[in-house]
Amino acid sequence: MSESFAQLFEESLKVLETRQGSIVSGTVVAIQKGFVLVDAGLKSESAIPVAEFLNAQGELEIQVGDTVNVALDAVEDGFGETKLSREKAVRHESWIELEKAYEEKATVIGLIXGKVKGGFTVELNGVRAFLPGSLVDTRPAREADHLLGKELEFKVIKLDQKRNNVVVSRRAVIESENSQEREQVLENLVEGSEVKGVVKNLTEYGAFVDLGGVDGLLHITDMAWKRVKHPSEIVNVGDEVTVKVLKFDKDRTRVSLGLKQLGQDPWAAIAENHPVNSKLTGKVTNLTDYGCFVEILDGVEGLVHVSEMDWTNKNIHPSKVVSLGDTVEVMVLEIDEERRRISLGLKQCKANPWTQFADTHNKGDKVTGKIKSITDFGIFIGLEGGIDGLVHLSDISWSISGEEAVRQYKKGDEVSAVVLAVDAVKERISLGIKQLEEDPFNNFVAINKKGAVVSATVVEADAKGAKVELAGGVEGYIRSADLTSEVAVGDVVEAKYTGVDRKSRIVHLSVKAKDQAEEAAAVASVNNKQEDIVIPNAMAEAFKAAKGE
């Protein structure tokens, strides 16, 4: 009973999590022109405009494989698709951060976007706040237009999410900055120097470190050389850390910090130490539909694309090959130092069945296998090593068309074939079934000399001529001009072999030429017999007189 209740409770939580307006976690599966495709594990993937993933500088903040929070606009819209919004999720997260900053009296970063009656509007990561003119500075300022477009620190002094009302103060920040400790820290800050601080706050994009009255931003991309999904993987609130000052804008009191810069960049000599085609051992750190990520060095992850996982199955799911945490051997296929990307291959560390086949088989060798599939263009036969060879329609039979011959076979049949060609690079093997027997056309040409009289059966006839079949299924043709009488399908005719068209594999025949040759031979035979007869003188003279000699 308790298990049933627990199950119902779990299902109710899932329903709540997928209600319209809820925030869900999704994975970036593709970045297309104008849209980012996100899979949140719902009914369908959702296309979100790229504009919702751009930062203030107009730069794309994500890449394929990243996990992002998105708001559920609709579980199913009018087209049966899930509709997600990154913009609403960012706004939701911003409200949470604003509430936290308000409670802890922490500073927030915002952009003074415009001037309104009584003050300015400030953009706080998707949330619009109001900055009263009296709270712009510690001293009354008649003209503060020079602040427009500037990114500054503020303190939240009023917050009402229901009414979408946020009031901030720049003066409060300035007043808190006017301390002796702060001045001392600012005086000693130098780009490139190492300083100590305490982690004050964590956000999705990084951590704020208190350097002693001055907050510095340790961005998530500067925490480690490897990919970091969330700052909590590296630091936690209250941690004392040593960081490097990357940038220091004294006028704006902006400090950018780095943690990974304290160590050596693992990408610095990666191409030299691990060139293309070299092999390494690494650990599987992430699985996606398009491949898996393998950490080959501390801080260096490479992608094994799904097409580089198995020699014979190009579309196999990565989870069928490796598991999270597996130690695997990979080969370096490509290195892009500028973009800090490395392409790896799993299958390249295993024997290549295509190369093995090429090494052990020559043109003309006989192979046997079962038919795996039959297509419009031929028959695929399974060979050793899990690879396939193709028998093209034109290589099935000498005597009948491929379309007719292929009907004699079915999936699962065991057949023999001859190796015609092997291309291990393109992973192609050409096979032939008809090559198991001698070519009847070539045999005919070799056995019969031009001028020989052969027997043929009429298979087609029209006004232009007759198509005939010779011994062994060889195709012949007799033009109507070379026929002495009408013929019908099934008639057997004797004809003279007059020529051959090797390209079309047709033997040309002539009944008329055969008959003419026979008549000429008969006349010659009669003349020869007449010359052999001895005629008496009287009769001879009479014979000559009759002939007018």
Curated annotation (Swiss-Prot):
One of its GO terms (molecular function) is structural constituent of ribosome. It holds the Pfam family S1. Keywords: Repeat, Ribonucleoprotein, Ribosomal protein, RNA-binding. Coiled coil: none annotated. Residues 21-87, 105-171, 192-260, 277-347, 364-434, 451-512 form the S1 motif domain. GO terms for biological process: translation. The keyword Ribosomal protein applies. One of its GO terms (cellular component) is cytosolic small ribosomal subunit. This is Small ribosomal subunit protein bS1. The lineage of its organism: Bacteria, Pseudomonadati, Pseudomonadota, Gammaproteobacteria, Pasteurellales.
